Every structure is written in C-alpha cells, then in structure tokens.
Amino acid sequence: MAKHLFTSESVSEGHPDKIADQISDAVLDAILQQDPKARVACETYVKTGMVLVGGEITTSAWVDIEEITRNTVREIGYVHSDMGFDANSCAVLSAIGKQSPDINQGVDRADPLEQGAGDQGLMFGYATNETDVLMPAPITYAHRLVQRQAEVRKNGTLPWLRPDAKSQVTFQYDDGKIVGIDAVVLSTQHAEDIDQKSLQEAVMEEIIKPILPSEWLNTSTKFFINPTGRFVIGGPMGDCGLTGRKIIVDTYGGMARHGGGAFSGKDPSKVDRSAAYAARYVAKNIVAAGLADRCEIQVSYAIGVAEPTSIMVETFGTEKVPAEQLILLVREFFDLRPYGLIQMLDLLHPIYKETAAYGHFGRENFPWEKTDKAQLLRDAAGLK
C-alpha cells in the first residue's frame, strides 16, 4: 500500500452511547469499591427523559443505582431541560438480576490461577509507533478533538457548546508514513442563539487548531464544522443510547481488528474486556521494545477454561526478530490466563468509569499502557 487515506472517528462524553457506557462503568466502579470479587454485567439504555439500567450482578455490595446515574449525567453536563436531558428530573429505572450459577461454576475455582474465562471469544490488541502513545494517529487525534470540545465547554471558553459532539479525522499516508491530514469533521451540539459563522470560527480557533499539529495541515486540508448548519437537538433527545455501541471508537478506530465484544459495564472476569486490555499491553510492549513497528495480538478463550485457546502475533512485515520468537516471548513474559492477567494489570480496582469516554487505549494512566516489559523483551530477543 503506497499512498492512501485512513479515517477514524470519536464521540464526546455527551454522546448518547457514551452516556450509557459511563453509567455502566460508574455502577461497576461503585461495586468494585466495596467488593473486588463482584461479578458485574451492567447495561444502560438512555432516551429522552429516562435511563434504564439492567444486567446481571452478583455482589455483597449495595450501591444506589439512581444516585450513581444522576451524578454521572450531571458530571457530563446535562443539567437543564433546554439541553434535552436533565440529570435532576430524568426517570431512572433499574432491572438488575444475578449472574447465572452455570457461568459461576465455570469461572470460580478453589485455585485462583485456574479461574476460567467468563465466556468464549476472541480479542485483539494493537500498537504502532506512529504516535508517542503508540496508537494510530487518526483515532488519537479524533479523541483529542472531542476531549478539547468538552474542556472548552466546561471551563466557559465556549459557553454555548452543549455536551453531544462527534469528530472524524482523515490522515494521508505514503508508504505507511503519515504525510498530512486530508479532512477534519467536527459536529457539536450548541445553544439556540449562536450563529453558524461564529460557531465555525470559534471551533476552528479554540478546538481544532490547538489540537492538530500544524505540520500535518495544508491548504488542501478540508474542514467540515457542523456541516448540517444546525445541531441544537442532541444527546438522548436526538438519539437513544446503549452501552457497548461504540466498540471501534473505544479501541483503534478501525486500524486494527476487533473481536466484537464491548467493554463497559463488565468486571475483569469477562475476558471481552480484560483480555483486550492485556492484548494491548502485550502489543504496546513489543513495539516499545523495538521488536516491531506495528503489532497486533489476537488471543482467544473457551468458557470455563483458564489457558487461552490461541495466541497470534501479527507484525505486518515490520518485525525485527522472527515471528516464531515473538510468540515464544509473549508466552514467556505475559500470563494471559484470566486470573494471571487480572493480577498482571491489577484490574480489581474502580478504574473503569474513566475509560468509558475518549478511548480505552493511549492514555498513560491506565495499567495496560505501561511499557515495563519492554526492556525485558528487548534483552530476551538479543537486541542491542
């Protein structure tokens, strides 16, 4: 592939699907705070004037679902009816059951190391050296644009902004290297009284220019700011939101494959989430070690079985050591059994609500973003 374009999108914390993700993970965090061994599968649905929280939860903890929901919506910024959604007046419904005992008997073990996977499935992790956080540039900058939108909305720089927003960035590549940005799309919900011209100028100056590196912008870069001309109705009034509907936004923006499992609302016994984090950790350490420029890891599981059913390493021809050696290094330095990866990444803590907007990867405060195995891998591979 010589010259080509690649596009990724992101959505803000006020997007309906992301509201749902954040509520699900806020419930998970509140439970893990009291009961680290809880089994949680929490799903959320949001629509005009209402939130429905459901799922299967087995725990000794008690949490106030309604209070957690209202606080989460309030923090996002939906605090008045003219925004189409109000944390103080929306209805909060709960439909929570317990996890099936048939699943429990496959997961729980007398020996924790033999803890089985909570379900079958395949998960992918990815890393590339095209950015400082070892993530693909298109999704990295799409996230940063909507993060900036939230920042200038909340700090009062652009007080007419509202919580719902989407971004999309198209990068130009030549022989695998970034040569520029071809197109930028940013759509943001706004108050009724701001005109289109003022909005476009402010978004360009306060959101786009501070985030996108000037060396990647040129006279042919196309900018689409609120291209429909109006975005007053947004959030749950504009669209219903569901947990787990933004799995590509949550991961690599389409640059890597995806096993199909969503993350939010799931405790770490669910390998959909924990093994995807572990696969990112493995891929990132391989790239950080200089063993490859790009790396994709696939891992798969059978329900109730501890050992992965498969591990695959793909380096797209960028490897500096033989592929067979990479597989051996992964097996030697990373414990990808469910209990092993939970311990390796210290996952039994309330760290998940923060993951639920702006991507689960590429933010250094998460334990799966550490590169503490990079030097070990490099030494074991015999690289100077």
From Swiss-Prot:
Q: In which pathway does it act?
A: Amino-acid biosynthesis; S-adenosyl-L-methionine biosynthesis; S-adenosyl-L-methionine from L-methionine: step 1/1
A GO molecular function assigned to this protein is: ATP binding
- Chain sites annotated for binding K(+): 43
Cofactor(s) needed by this chain: Mg(2+); K(+)
Question: Where along this sequence does the record place binding of ATP?
Answer: 15, 164-166, 230-231, 239, 245-246, 262, 266
Q: Does the keyword ATP-binding apply?
A: yes
Name the segments for region: Flexible loop. 99-109
| Primary localization | cytoplasm
Assigned EC number: 2.5.1.6
Enumerate the residues binding Mg(2+): 17
Intracellular or extracellular location(s)? Cytoplasm
The UniProt entry, under InterPro entries, shows:
ADOMET_SYNTHASE_CS, S-AdoMet_synt_C, S-AdoMet_synt_central, S-AdoMet_synt_N, S-AdoMet_synthetase, S-AdoMet_synthetase_sfam
Q: Which family does it belong to?
A: Belongs to the AdoMet synthase family.
Q: How does it assemble?
A: Homotetramer; dimer of dimers.
Q: Which HAMAP family did the record assign? A: S_AdoMet_synth1 (MF_00086)
- Give the function comment from the record: Catalyzes the formation of S-adenosylmethionine (AdoMet) from methionine and ATP. The overall synthetic reaction is composed of two sequential steps, AdoMet formation and the subsequent tripolyphosphate hydrolysis which occurs prior to release of AdoMet from the enzyme.
Q: What is this protein called?
A: S-adenosylmethionine synthase
**Source species, please?**
Salmonella typhimurium (strain LT2 / SGSC1412 / ATCC 700720)
